[in-house]
Amino acid sequence: MSRILKNIAVSLWLLFIASLICSSKVRNVKNLNLRSVQEIYANMFAADSRVLDDDIAGGFAYSMYPNLSKINFSFGLNDTQKPLDERNGKTNFNGRFDATSIVQLNPKIKLRGGATYSRSVKKSVKWNSTSDFEFLYPYFLADSVGGDRHYEYYSFNGAYAHTAGRLFYAFSGKYKASHEWGEVDPRPRNIVSDMSLSTSVGYKSRKHMFSLNMAYRVYNQDQNMRFVNPDGANAIEWHLTGIGSHYARFAGNGIYIFTRYEGRGYTANLLMQSLSKTGLNAGITYNNIAINRLLVNQNYTPATNLYKHRAETFVTYRRQSGGLIYGAEVAVAAGFHRGIENISDNGITDNFKVLARLPMYKENLFDGRVSGLVQMTWRRSAVYFSPGVEFNRKLETYKFPAKSMSIARGTGNLKCGFVFSIEKWLLHIEEKPVYSYCYKSKLVNNDELMEPVIRRCLDRQFQIEAMNFFANNIRLSVQRQFQKIGSLGLSLSWTHSRFLDGVKGENLYISTYLIF
């Protein structure tokens, strides 16, 4: 662990020094507050931020703020009464460090880099012993005892873009890793590595940039479960397979709980990006990934195979008339997941051959989002309102015993904010109330042999997914520009949540940052 932390610290420090050196050569700190305002406006719509995503190599090639670095320290406090979803637990405190930088070395070459490190403790985790369980769902390890989990996460990303007239090409890479462990039985120790490489080619017209982007992803997780005394362990680990089903053959706390997940996938998208703060942005994306769950002590026999596909498209449009800017966003996405359970032999010859592959699990997803924007600007200030409505629908089915779970919900929000700039100061205030209503939910469970403890877990999961909730987020940011070092800022974000069964939550995030 100490070696990992040392490597992280050295890498972050080198990134910081490199950013300072580059910035001292090519940057001017006069317009840092203006660039911060541009960043606020550029990410007003959720879909617009997609063109600047770390996984897209060329998204920053013609950004409105070509030279910008930011170092951010933040920590969060959570005062939720109890975990809403026991599988995630609750995080009372977490700390985070972020560093990002975009540097234009010359008129043709632009670089981007970033790093993140965070540390937290998840309290009272139950019915989940696997990291990234939402991504691996429904195939993850779980038990009814649980406990606290220590969690570390770090990531590094970098990109290179080269322009030649109206054409450009770019390459990028991103590496994410996490370490999650428990100190009381059951003691999971999960190590995750997630790497993606992408390339982009594009064309710049007078008002837009068009790009084709391709990315390849490699995901691995090694799960090592330990007990002080397995013979007297008070927990049974289940390899869940969907809607309360599990691999009865591999249940227990012995050799079957050592697991490895291997995922390989790719992403392809077409993007059209406006080169100004108004105009049209649009994109279409397809991604898929295949994830195998391997039993380590059974000669890496594949217990399950999960295939995930997702397609999405979005269009955003802005128009300006004097000091008035207005716009709209429409986004639609659909996904389908297919799960296969493998039947293997008894391993007498240590081969553990797969004898049959059974398609048992299906999940269909649909998401739609519509939002608008009205922004009124004056010389030193601006006010904006952005209402939005989102619809989500999913249907899970399990083949035998026949089970299904369907959820449909609508969510509305109203984001409103105020931006004020005077001399070297910048003030940003934003409020976003959200209300989500589940208008359709149904659970069909024909499994008469399901263990009572798992049945209670399934009922609780269904209750959570069908729950209505209200949340309100208020954010305040104050930024002050200095001539030699850049801009220093402080940001406070407070969220109040209230759920149907009386659970309340309070979250406070405090960030201090330097922009240069």
Question: Predicted regions: what is each one?
Answer:
Residues 28-37, 205, 504-516:
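Outer-membrane beta-barrel "beta-signal"
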Residues 159-183, 192-198, 281-296, 384-392:
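Surface-exposed extracellular loop regions of Gram-negative outer-membrane beta-barrel proteins
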Residues 22-117, 121-123:
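N-terminal, post-signal peptide beta-strand-biased segments of exported outer-membrane/organellar beta-barrel
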Residues 132-141, 239-515:
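Outer membrane beta-barrel transmembrane domains
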Residues 80-96, 147, 178-192, 257-259, ...:
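Outer-membrane beta-barrel proteins
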